[in-house]
Amino acid sequence: MITAILKFDISNTFTQWEQAFYTHQPVARAAGLYELYHGHEPGNDKRVVVVLNCLSEEHMQKFIEANGKAMASSGHILESTVTEIYVN
């Protein structure tokens, strides 16, 4: 199991992105990705962070590849994503 921290920019408001994020959570959970936290930078609601647990970095990448279109339609600017991986 890994913990991933994803930081990225969005093209819409945080509220709009968050609504789409919540809508897609059942798909993510069914795929084995479990969100621990999400939020935005103070004073900058266009810079978002998501912290999640999943099986492996490869598992997360496969999910992103399969669901990239839905992620982009939420306002997530995919090419802005910076990922940090932690293991225990």
Residue ranges and their predicted role:
Residues 72-74:
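Short, exposed beta-strand-loop hairpins at the edges of beta-sheets
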Residues 1-70, 79-88:
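Short S/T/G/P-rich N-terminal loop/turn motif that feeds into the first structured element of a domain
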